[in-house]
Amino acid sequence: MIKSQTPRHDYYHILNLPFTTPPAALSKQQLKIAYHKALLKHHPDKAISVAATPARTHTHDTKTAYRSSPDRNADTSPTFTIDEITAAYKTLSDPALRAEYDRVLRLERVTAGKGDKGAEAAFHTGLEVVDLEDLVCEEMGDGEGLLCWYRGCRCGDERGFMVTEKDLEKEAEHGEVVIGCRGCSLWMKILFAMEEGDG
């Protein structure tokens, strides 16, 4: 389960991987390579150390001159701990943990607001909150008898927002699922409750 407190930086940023919607398929090899690159980049022994004593160069009059050492503040890229890198790798390499992490991350990005206008800012990001009963329900054509719910989006996609029984079962504990439109960048939060005897 993902902790409610978000890390200093998101796990995709730590491993220098793209966070896309819908989530891009990342192979175990891609994750492992990104993990090793992050470890090498942020390893304390590999980091460029600024010497405590300045480097000396000799001038023509044999006086010692001091070179300015590289400014560490010039590189504004964050440094991550080994623990942060390991947590990112473990979360993104486990399909269940990654799905939960992605859900939390998408929700945070969609509903993030600033100051007193937080709710208003969240509204402007395109998150619409609806009940499952507000969507059209039909049986999927996969022969398994599974149901799907959909609703058109203002971008013109008649099935822009689509959720399946399997999606709802995964989020049964939360009673809500956040989905993005298939045709644009709008989001919808669907509220639902599992009936007795379901799941």
Curated annotation (Swiss-Prot):
Q: Name one GO molecular function term.
A: metal ion binding
Annotated Zn(2+) binding lies at: C153, C155, C181, C184
Show where the J domain sits: 10-105
Question: Which InterPro entries does the record cross-reference, listed alphabetically?
Answer: DnaJ_domain (IPR001623), DPH3/4-like (IPR044248), DPH_MB_dom (IPR007872), DPH_MB_sf (IPR036671), J_dom_sf (IPR036869)
Keywords on this record?
Answer: Cytoplasm, Iron, Metal-binding, Nucleus, Zinc
User: Origin organism of this chain?
Assistant: Aspergillus fumigatus (strain ATCC MYA-4609 / CBS 101355 / FGSC A1100 / Af293)
What ranges does the record give for the region Disordered, renumbered to this chain? 55-77
Keyword check for Cell division = no
- Could you tell me where this protein is found in the cell? Cytoplasm; Nucleus
Q: Does the UniProt entry include the keyword Cytoplasm?
A: yes
Pathway per its UniProt entry is: Protein modification; peptidyl-diphthamide biosynthesis
| The protein's name in its UniProt record | Diphthamide biosynthesis protein 4
